[in-house]
């Protein structure tokens, strides 16, 4: 899964990458720095702790990302 959403503070999008096949779990933040995680669970936890709807141009994009993360977590937990 790759997802982009636009921060109020940057011309470049924030990017979320969850790639189970290749073991890549990373984000690019508004300041274009990044974070790399050991698992999708760590990445999701970081996003929920550090990003808020008010950080982004579109609340809709933010909530859609949260839905995607919820669905992803459900699929992993249920083994689908």
Model-flagged regions — what are they?
Residues 1-5:
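Short, hydrophobic/aromatic-rich segments at coil-to-beta transitions
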Residues 8-31:
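Short aromatic-glycine-(Arg/Gly/Cys) micro-motifs in beta-strand/loop hairpins
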Residues 35-80:
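Mixed-charge, Lys/Arg-enriched low-complexity segments
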